[in-house]
C-alpha cells in the first residue's frame, strides 16, 4: 500500500483500471474478416509459443492503431526469442549483459527455453525489437541459431516497433471478470 492507503500492484495501475472500467465493451469480439488480424504462423517444434503469442498481439494492436498495415504486420519471433537469452559479448558496450537469463543457454536452446508475457515485455520494452520477419526469419531452430550467432551486432537494437506502454495482469486472477474484461480492451 502507498501512503494514501491505495493498494499497489505491478500488474495494474488503479487509475488506468478505473478509466478502462468506465468504457463500454462490446458483447463479443472477433477480428476474423477485418483488417485487424494477421495469419496464424507455425512455431514448428520449438518452445517459442510465448514469442508467437506476444508478437501476434502486438501485430494486431499495431493494425488497429494504423501503425502497421496487413502487408507490414509480420514481426520476427526469431529475433525476440534469440535476444531474450543471448547477452551481448562486447564488454565495452553499454548494452553488455542485457538479456533475460543469467543461465548459460546453448544457441539452439534459445528457441526451446520457453518464455512468457513478462519475458516478451521486458525484451520489447528494452527496445530490442520488434523487427520485421524479413530481418530474422523463423526457420528450424538449428538454422536460426546459426544465422543469429553470425548476425551483425546491430540487429539486436533494430526495431520497427517499440513497446512504450503495457500492462501485466496477474495470471492468478484469470477467473476475475474485471481483469479479463480489461485485457479485451
Protein language model annotation of sequence segments:
Residues 21, 38-40, 58:
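Short, solvent-exposed loop/turn elements at domain surfaces
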Residues 24-25, 30, 50-59, 79-185:
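Predominantly the structural core of cysteine protease catalytic domains
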Residues 35-46, 107-110:
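A short glycine/serine-rich beta->alpha loop
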Residues 43-68:
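Alpha-helical support elements that line or immediately flank enzyme active sites
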Residues 64, 69-70, 95, 139:
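Residue-level detector of alpha-helical recognition elements and their boundaries
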Amino acid at each position: 500500500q502507498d501512503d494514501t492507503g491505495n493498494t499497489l500492484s505491478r500488474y495494474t495501475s488503479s487509475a488506468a483500471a478505473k478509466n478502462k472500467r468506465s468504457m463500454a465493451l462490446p458483447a463479443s469480439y472477433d477480428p476474423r474478416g477485418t483488417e485487424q488480424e494477421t495469419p496464424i504462423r507455425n512455431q514448428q517444434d520449438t518452445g517459442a509459443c510465448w514469442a508467437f503469442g506476444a508478437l501476434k498481439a502486438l501485430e494486431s494492436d499495431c493494425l488497429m492503431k494504423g501503425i502497421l498495415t496487413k502487408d507490414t504486420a509480420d514481426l520476427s519471433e526469431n529475433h525476440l526469442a534469440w535476444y531474450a537469452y543471448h547477452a551481448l559479448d562486447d564488454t565495452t558496450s553499454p548494452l553488455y549483459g542485457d538479456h533475460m537469463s543469467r543461465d548459460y543457454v546453448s544457441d539452439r536452446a534459445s528457441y526451446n527455453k520457453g518464455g512468457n508475457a513478462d519475458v516478451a515485455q521486458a525484451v520489447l520494452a528494452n527496445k530490442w525489437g520488434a523487427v520485421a520477419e524479413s530481418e530474422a526469419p523463423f526457420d528450424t531452430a538449428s538454422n536460426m541459431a546459426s544465422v543469429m550467432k553470425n548476425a551483425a551486432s546491430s540487429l539486436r537494437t533494430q526495431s520497427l516497433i517499440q513497446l512504450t506502454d503495457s500492462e501485466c495482469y496477474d495470471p492468478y486472477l484469470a477467473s476475475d471478470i474485471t481483469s479479463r474484461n480489461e485485457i479485451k480492451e
